[in-house]
Amino acid sequence: MDTPNKDDSIIRFSVSLQQNLLDELDNRIIKNGYSSRSELVRDMIREKLVEDNWAEDNPNDESKIAVLVVIYDHHQRELNQRMIDIQHASGTHVLCTTHIHMDEHNCLETIILQGNSFEIQRLQLEIGGLRGVKFAKLTKASSFEYNE
């Protein structure tokens, strides 16, 4: 018989909330299609842990992962080349890019990045500030372990 992994065990605990906060939690469960309060609370905790992990300013921590979504006018002169130059000059690892044509004027590009939080966020600001970029949103993640 396999011994349960520490990560596999579920611990039950209770939380005290005001009624209006509980009502808001229950509304989000319905709105987002969660099967239980526990599922929503677990996701909220994970999201907060990722947020806190990104807030730790450790230039040697290369465990940050992010996806940068960029929408831009592909008729803007030399914009694509400037975006590529910024990626090459960055201290971040560009793991993958995907480019799609949305319509006759707009392209959407996703850029998957790995590195430290400062370099990733700097790349997002540099690309987002280019003339012709209409949207630049960074979705942050982390590859750190929660059980340490």
Swiss-Prot record:
GO terms, biological process: negative regulation of DNA-templated transcription; regulation of DNA-templated transcription; response to nickel cation
Required cofactor names: Ni(2+)
SUPFAM superfamilies with a match to the protein in the record: ACT-like, Ribbon-helix-helix
Superkingdom as given in the UniProt entry: Bacteria
Manner of cofactor binding, per the entry note: Binds 1 nickel ion per subunit.
Sites where the protein binds Ni(2+): H88, H99, H101, C107
Transmembrane segments: none
GO molecular-function terms, A-Z: DNA binding; DNA-binding transcription repressor activity; identical protein binding; nickel cation binding; sequence-specific DNA binding; transcription cis-regulatory region binding
GO cellular component: protein-DNA complex
UniProt-listed InterPro entries: Acetolactate_synth/TF_NikR_C, ACT-like_dom_sf, Arc_rbn_hlx_hlx, CopG, CopG/NikR_regulator, Ni_resp_reg_NikR, Ribbon_hlx_hlx, TF_NikR_Ni-bd_C
UniProt entry keywords in alphabetical sequence: DNA-binding, Metal-binding, Nickel, Transcription, Transcription regulation
Pfam families, alphabetized: NikR_C, RHH_1
Similarity annotation: Belongs to the transcriptional regulatory CopG/NikR family.
Function description: Transcriptional regulator.
Assembly behavior: Homotetramer.
Protein's name in the database: Putative nickel-responsive regulator
Organism listed in the record: Helicobacter pylori (strain ATCC 700392 / 26695)
